Amino acid sequence: MVHKPVLLNEVVEALSPKDGSVYVDATFGGGGYSRRILETAQCVVYAIDQDVVVKKYFDELLQSFPGRLNLAISRFSKLREVVLSFGVDKVDGVVFDLGTSAMQLADASRGFSFMNSGSLDMRMCSSALRDAAMFVNTVPEKEMADVIYQYGGERYSRRVARAIIDARRKCRINNTGDLATIIRSAVPRSRVHPIDPATRTFQAIRIWVNNELEELQAGLEAAAEVLKIGGKILVTSFHSLEDRVVKHKFRSLCDMGFSLINKKAIMPTDEEVKNNPRSRSGKLRAIARVE
């Protein structure tokens, strides 16, 4: 399954790539943003992704744009170091497409989805020290409930944590299917918001495993450091926690020589949501360095 980048047209329009410019695609994934940027102008893209699986998509895209595309397998909190490692000091723009990719969700062995039972992993970087199995089978009940509430917004977080603790006392929880069943037993299904009861808890665990909010904060700070005057940072987020980090960081940057490109987040059109249901929760925020 190929990942469809959300708000692609809006991102490229706001970025407005120019010939001779240098851009960073901080979340390469399937290469959708990078491809469109490279098609739009005779520029160079430095791509970053912590998932080694993306090398396949990078190699394919490189054939179309030899000498103009580079990849570093790294976290975007290391963005500044990556840019410097390529011999570049400042760039003209940085784009972020947050969250999981369609490829990650489709691969049951990665553990990101409960649609098909797979390993309790959820690591975006295969060398990361902690995974979902560690969270589910070792984290104390109170900490577990707090994570599920804070990162997932799950109002029944205490019930979910209690159900997981009770289940792991009987035997180790080893796969996403079993975990989803345990969560569903603790969360009443809502008639008003008919999402799967496991959705919020899976999101919370994924954020914990990958330290996503701290990574995002560090990535935005690094992007601001490497940006030229006139350069832009664009971020597409998919849940309120991510969006809050972006909004607050952009607000603080406005006191440091930056200006918002759009005061309100840009949302996907009805047509895009119809063609790509994943886009429905997408929000694009953009900021430019003006001094």
Curated annotation (Swiss-Prot):
S-adenosyl-L-methionine binds at G31, G32, Y33, D49, F76, D97, Q104. It is found in: Cytoplasm. It comes from the Bacteria. Gene3D superfamilies: Putative methyltransferase TM0872, insert domain, Vaccinia Virus protein VP39. It is an enzyme of class 2 (transferase). InterPro entries: RsmH, SAM-dep_MeTrfase_MraW_recog, SAM-dependent_MTases_sf. It catalyses: cytidine(1402) in 16S rRNA + S-adenosyl-L-methionine = N(4)-methylcytidine(1402) in 16S rRNA + S-adenosyl-L-homocysteine + H(+). Its main location: cytoplasm. Keywords: Cytoplasm, Methyltransferase, rRNA processing, S-adenosyl-L-methionine, Transferase. Disulfide bonds: none annotated. It holds the Pfam family Methyltransf_5. This is Ribosomal RNA small subunit methyltransferase H. It comes from Anaplasma marginale (strain Florida).
